[in-house]
């Protein structure tokens, strides 16, 4: 450690190299040895494993190997580990001879090689088979022990008496003892099947092999005992799955009281407890210890814990490569375990200051239950002891009790019978019963009492006596003794756990012990050895060797290999018998059974197959229909079972059916016929929603009861000034009773029909938000608009729509105006046949495939056309091909119109294209013939004919609407290619029929056919398939069972010769050319697709007709309105096997089986008539009182709604509030943070005490009033912008032109051109070239992905800048400040507050990807900043590169952000007063500082060109030294350096440069600028103003003598200016104060004036103007005289346009607070300058009303920083 510190101290000196020379010399030889022994390429992730295993690999190898780590381990085993153990001559078994020679060359003691061919693969490994066993005392067995069991090894020792030591290498995963999943998946994987383990090294499946599963038993043995011999087994070393074992002979067995243990290295993990009463495999409960500990602390440290937070925390770790061994089930178990146990806390008390009595009471209260339970069993010993020691219990009893002369207990007689003999007792009792005693004279009675014969009567008398009760029997005594023990058991069962048990259980379950892979070693007992080899070693004769087949072994033999063992030869298993085909009789029986079941007749399945039952009537009727008993599909296969055939009644003409019968006709509350609602209550309804049937109500208001399911009324009432019952009364006034009370209303609730009725009555428009789209209802363009949400359920429910900040994906699709217009378009009272537009994601590979084939001439003819070299079609294809190479996928709206041939797909679209909304269209068709049809139908003027293109020419034209006819006849990928070729396309309308033919390339080299068929890709966009035709005659339509509107009956005939003047459809191009040469009008069937002929067509049948698909045959049969002539070889349509099925059906008049001929047919959503209404009828009703039993402990927390607002808190299961404070919560809420970002927040509570801020009173003199010459703003603005061509300022690269000076459709009123042309405008949304053209100026790239390496100049210049920066602050460069954890904690709070408050919660939620763990934190996303920067440098300027912003990972912002704030607070104390930085200060403070410090009229101003890009590695060195000075922890400094040297973007890796958006951009730029200034000048007390790259120096300080040498090292380009009127941050500064630059302010006012938002921006610009205006007449001394007219023009505009309340700010009196209140209430936009000076209450009001843009420097954060400055003074920090 001391030597390392010394090297660090010498880092900047020349002595470091000499000091490191011995270190380098000592490393040369080991490095060379490592490269020589291990020359293979090793992944970085494997190097720590190999080094920890003691294998000296360098990682600099360059030879590839499929499993390099295993090769390194094997090499180390052989040439390092085994080589030192061969101390005497030794034998080697199962090794290639070449490898044995290398091993023997290292150690000559390897004398003998013994190999045995035991499998077929061994003949390649081993040239010969050994005929004897090893003969030396030491034997090395290479990678074969897993194929032998202990009894075989015992036999080897018995057969080789000289063998003493057997060294074996064993390849077996130790974790296979309890799981089938590897704990090192990057190193090896394996699977277990039965008793076989399949091992795959490093993903190299070609090198995988099988081995017995019980090979793991070798790692569980320490000895092998047998009656013949004892062997000892020892594990010498382990390298992951490779183990070195030693088996020795004859060691005595020493008995031991403890078993030996063996352990293996595995990842640091612990097992989660099993769920209660559930079995969970151990492998899926193993989780990393560090992740568990961090998650355990996290769930108890956060303020609020949501149900998703543990999963989000796990998400941040699950993708780390070091945790690849953890299974997904284990991660799931971990987050579930953490979530469910988060509320659990240990039940402990820490009372240290209790009195002894209180401690005793506390002890008894905690342990009374356990003490009683433990004491009760001892009470059972008392009854037996008492029975043994005593005869019984003496029990006192009352023998006589007399009260009030009445005897209660004892004898009631007067005579004492005991005084008389027993024989006289009856006589005495008789005398007493006769009443003798009362008759005795008193003297006699008294004498008898004295003698003890007669009892004395008294008022109270009590006599007692003792009686002994004997103990019960021993059985009863035993039962009594067992009662306390039983009571103890009972109390222990029902009593709660003791505190100690709770504490132990808490620690055992929530702090489980680490998992160690270890076990005890056992002894293996062998009764008799098994043969080591399953063959005889006697060499056979040559003849016998040739004649005999190779032996087949029953035992799996050992299989040594070169690198890894190979599997044994698999046993031959006879193939299983394939399933026999089902008998034909059984098929017929099954079919007849299905027919009987459909006709409700008994099934004939019980009848024997030999005598089938008669055909039922239903089958006979079916057989009479004109259908094929055997049909032929498109592949020529026979379908033995007939499929459903379309009904021939499709073309019967039926009138439009009336409204369905309902209760309306019998409803007595209404009158008149059943009509549509909009007929009775006419209005302009949305989407035909007023077309539901109803009748006119004839009775007064209905008395229908209020519905129970009234959620629709509740949703509407919440947004209107009516109650639910009032809305119901409106319905009762308008609708019949049958629409108010019916089964639908009672069971399901109210529908949108009722909503339409209410919308007419109250005249409102309703937007219903469903999970898929938004549907408008009610009156169009109504003044009142309400929003309702529709929940699909169950149960379905209406509720008031709440505009949520975040929504589920796809829940709020945005339909373009074009899509809405297409949905509304009607032709012939019918809508277009589609339901909605679809989002098509462009496939760049499809487009690339097509353009490559076109470029090479394989598809299309464009590449073969000639033209000028720079504008030839070939060159256009090459340019388009280059464009596709750099294109990215995007999405575009597509509408698919599909239907049967002749259904009228094109005609409605032609009418749509004639509407104004669709006039900017372009048509793409596959053939010129089809283009001619469109040209004739559209009848466009000559100037618009270019819009009608064939598919190739359409690629080079542009429009926002694309119509593609016969899309399936175009090459695959054409839609993707044309969308990439023209990014302006907003909507694509595709016309086509997937049942017709598709494109086939005629060139054999075309690879277009390898792509997925377009019928599969694009048919998913089909909403409706029009199952009718206007073209086909009835004869053709009946073939397909499709309805036709053609009144012509038509015909299908066979003729012998070509009818004259008719179109001829042929099968091939060659045939078409031949017929055309003979004078016939001929074309191929494929090229006729999309064409319509009024005359009959001729179809030529030849041998090619057998090859055409049913799709092409459908095209041929559906071209004519009249009929079809077949000519040629009629055999091809004879219906025989192998003939054309479609043409056979046409000639025989049999229906076409659509299911068999077209596999896609059953997936098409058929519609049988045009769409007349787009009305969406929704029904819902939800009763909130319904109780749904919860499924778990927190049902409402674990099931989130599809739309989650940012304030959603029902998923919070724990909320930890402030315990010891009554102050309000100052931390911002974190509920809305994504679960992956929340772990990055510390969420600390600030401990900074509040401070009292005081404001000083200005003692400045009263200013003099201004005196301006009159200047009209409008007149000056009219000639301010010179007339010019904005296009000349744009930049053009290739065929792309920038858009920084747009002037088309821009408003202007002041001059002849828009005022926005004054300066370049950066709008990435409308200028796709902005970022691309700016990359070369704003970004600097490093040559490769390797990290940036600091140069010596970087180190020298970085230290030099740091020294001069310290000089500016008056610091010692070598001094450091102790780190202050309390202040850093406050900076963490401040940084998190800034991150949570700088953007809205919805923005943070939408940017959840910024905390995605899959996003490497060294990758930043560069995007262009949208701004219109207007200053002296940009006004009248040309094209300007945009400012690039770097979007970094939240980890970087939240980790390094506190570091920069900590540095800012520390640096604030040392900064001299004469150095001004503008960060966190207002223009008022700038004016005050200028008035106090600036003097004279000599100033040096400086700005830099490309300041951010000019800071190289020296800036990183400089920043790291600044961080080190204030005591920033080393790991944070290293993180900063690592990020700066490894940053990469979507455009490539960047070199060291400043990125706008990285933490501390402004502070580091300001410090760099300040360090350069003090390097250039010798400054003593010259006032300096610094802000980023802008600076002003008051006076002329002398040049530093070292500056010429320093300047050569810098990469900066200075723009130094000496002036008397300096401009700083847009303000002219001077001794009198500061003033806003009138020139720039005038230009901004012009731009705002032309845009029409002057009244929104006027208050902010007025405030900026008032900063200088309030100085009085001296303001004229701050700016040049030629700017006075602009100042006067601004003054003129403010005087005329501002209100009286706004003009108060221009007075010299203090600004009243009411001014800011009025300003905030009337302003829609507030500039940064104005916002910084507003009071806190006004700022909060602006923030709450969303009038505040996201500023880079939040004044609220700066205010909190100022509080920290006053709370942590620098002197106290330095003394701690």
UniProtKB/Swiss-Prot annotation:
Q: Where is the Alphavirus-like MT domain?
A: 58-219
Q: Which InterPro entries match?
A: (+)RNA_virus_helicase_core_dom, Alphavirus-like_MT_dom, DNA/RNA_pol_sf, P-loop_NTPase, Peptidase_C21, RNA-dep_RNA_pol_alsuvir, RNA-dir_pol_PSvirus, TYMV_endopept_dom
Q: Which residue stretches does the UniProt record annotate as biased composition, category Pro residues?
A: 546-582
- Coiled-coil regions listed in the entry: none
Enzyme nomenclature, EC number: 2.1.1.-, 3.4.22.-, 3.6.4.-, 2.7.7.48
Name the Gene Ontology biological process terms.
DNA-templated transcription; methylation; mRNA modification; proteolysis; RNA processing; symbiont-mediated perturbation of host ubiquitin-like protein modification; viral RNA genome replication
List the active site: 711, 797
Disulfide connectivity for this sequence is none
List, in alphabetical order, the Gene Ontology terms for molecular function in this entry: ATP binding; cysteine-type endopeptidase activity; mRNA methyltransferase activity; RNA binding; RNA-directed RNA polymerase activity
Q: Which Pfam families match?
A: Peptidase_C21, RdRP_2, Viral_helicase1, Vmethyltransf
Site positions per UniProt: Cleavage: 806-807, 1180-1181
Its PTM note reads:
Specific enzymatic cleavages by the host yield mature proteins.
The record places domain (+)RNA virus helicase ATP-binding at 866-1026
The segment(s) forming the Peptidase C21 domain are 658-812
Occurrences of domain RdRp catalytic (ranges): 1497-1603
Which keywords belong to this entry? ATP-binding, Host-virus interaction, Hydrolase, Methyltransferase, Modulation of host ubiquitin pathway by viral deubiquitinase, Modulation of host ubiquitin pathway by virus, Multifunctional enzyme, Nucleotide-binding, Nucleotidyltransferase, Protease, RNA-directed RNA polymerase, Thiol protease, Transferase, Viral RNA replication
Name the residues that bind ATP: 899-906
Q: Where is this region: Disordered?
A: 546-583, 595-615
Q: Which family does it belong to?
A: Belongs to the Tymoviridae non-structural replication polyprotein family.
**Protein name (Swiss-Prot/TrEMBL):** Non-structural replication polyprotein
Source organism = Ononis yellow mosaic virus
